[in-house]
Amino acid sequence: MISENAPSSPSSKPLLRALRGEAVWPPPVWLMRQAGRYLPEFRAMRDRADFLTRCMTPDMATELTIQPIRRYGMDGAILFSDILILPWAMGQSLEFIDGRGPVLGAIRSEADLARLDPKRVQDAVAPVRETLSRLTKELPDVTTLLGFAGSPFTVSCYMVEGGGSRDFAETRRMMQTNPALFDRLIDTLTSSTAEMLCGQIEAGAEAVMLFDSWAGILPPSAFRRYVIEPTRQIVEYIRARHPKTPIIGFPRLGGIMVREYAQKTGVNTLALDTVADPAQISELVSEVRPGLTLQGNMDPMILFSGGETMIREAQAIRDAMRGKPHVFNLGHGVMQHTPPENVAALVEAVRAV
């Protein structure tokens, strides 16, 4: 256990304050994929169990979540899990293969979709809720606990393709040739994601994040239909049950569509990818969502490279957002071979006054 202190109030948690719209200085910092293979202590646990087992074993998932907090004192601890836990929980086969990534039984027909059972989800993900419950007791009092899920469109891409893809051709084909089937898949994921995130909040998550990693492959009309609308429905559902819980949305590579995303989804925080300029995006969305928190967005490659260039870039992003609600993060996940000392230097640079 890291902390023996009495429970703190939300006002003492810098990340939670920023996610609720406060301009905190210096900005809170956490990193996507901060619990990952770049850490030697993470690699040491890889030999003990496969990836899915680590996600679904509370002892392991708790330890993996805490590792970057213990090492760096991050302001946020994001649950160690995976966006594909949801389709697995509904009954889709899932295996993580070294060098290849996730492999799922592809959804290509009505019969394939019919084999999934959303009613299984809450029981199947009970170990995830147990992990969150344990983390509420073991994290430092100033650390905000983050839950997360994949957004419906991104999760559907993996479900239809049967894994990762360069172009998600089968997903795009289904959208065109069998839109009714694809719509049912999106609807199923939307309701199940909303319910699963509420379960995470009830288990202890203080904020949740929706990862839409492949949002940027869609043209505007499809982006509205399959990214904005499902996200809006999820936010609405969560807010009805947990009105004070901040929600972070990450429509990666959404480009100009992020303005409409910010306006219509209702997320509290807009996470930015590496190609976005935080100051420009802040100005772009200020008319439709004044006071919206932005999160991001240093290039993970700059973190990988380290040195003075990294320090200058990190502080330039930080300084450009001074006086506005901002959470420092990357524009994508920490790269596998990133030197751990670079992460330490980054956190120090962001926090330097």
Swiss-Prot record:
Species per Swiss-Prot/TrEMBL record: Gluconobacter oxydans (strain 621H)
Recorded superkingdom: Bacteria
Main location: cytoplasm
Full protein name: Uroporphyrinogen decarboxylase
Enzyme nomenclature, EC number: 4.1.1.37
Subunit description: Homodimer.
Site for Transition state stabilizer, residues: 82
Family matches, as Gene3D superfamilies: 3.20.20.210
Keyword line: Cytoplasm, Decarboxylase, Lyase, Porphyrin biosynthesis
Family designation: Belongs to the uroporphyrinogen decarboxylase family.
Classification via CDD domains: URO-D
Cellular component GO terms, alphabetical: cytosol
The reaction(s) this protein catalyses: uroporphyrinogen III + 4 H(+) = coproporphyrinogen III + 4 CO2
Record pathway: Porphyrin-containing compound metabolism; protoporphyrin-IX biosynthesis; coproporphyrinogen-III from 5-aminolevulinate: step 4/4
Top-level EC class: lyase
Biological process annotations from GO: protoporphyrinogen IX biosynthetic process from glutamate
Function summary: Catalyzes the decarboxylation of four acetate groups of uroporphyrinogen-III to yield coproporphyrinogen-III.
A GO MF label: uroporphyrinogen decarboxylase activity
Signal peptide: none
Compartment(s) of residence: Cytoplasm
Ligand binding (substrate): 33-37, 82, 158, 213, 332
Record-linked Pfam families: URO-D
